[in-house]
Amino acid sequence: MASLRRLTELLCLPVTATAADIKTAYRRTALKYHPDKGGDEEKMKELNTLMEEFRETEGLRADETLEDSDPEPEESGYATFENVSVPDIDGAFFKLMKLKKCMQTYFSVNERRKQDIRPEYFELFKAFQDVPWKVLEDFFTSEMF
């Protein structure tokens, strides 16, 4: 805490300055005290030391807030790395194949529907054509699971 007070003194900032204010003032003051610019070498060393301490404590605070804000896997919507059962895999496979069959039926040429084809149909048809159905079938039927 004393080092923060000394840092804000050296930077000519109030003690209530934000981290962004401190970083901006540090850049400005570093140019002023830099030995290559004719500044005071001792003050530059002190400024660098205090700024390093500030960055470390700022990093610790950021780590603490990250730890507190990490959602649990079941809350985040992301899958966990638990084992998936064979019935779950089979269920997913059969749902994909049912979707494939429904889409094939939809995309089959029907004389009555030809007059009602809209641009959305063509976009959906192209997306359906781009799905690697053979790869999915091979993946789900492999002995890997």
Swiss-Prot record:
InterPro entries in the cross-refs: DnaJ_domain (IPR001623), J_dom_sf (IPR036869)
Cellular component terms per the entry's GO annotation: host cell cytoplasm; host cell nucleus
UniProt keyword Phosphoprotein present: yes
Start-end of Acidic residues biased regions: 65-75
Domain J stretches: 6-82
Keyword hit for Isomerase: no
Domain of life: Viruses
UniProt-annotated location(s): Host cytoplasm; Host nucleus
Quaternary state and interactors: Interacts with host PPP2R1A; the interaction inhibits PP2A activity.
Domain notes from UniProt: The common region of ST and LT proteins comprises the J domain. This domain is essential for multiple viral activities, including virion assembly, viral DNA replication, transformation and transcriptional activation. This domain is also required for cyclin A-transactivating activity of ST.
Name of this protein: Small t antigen
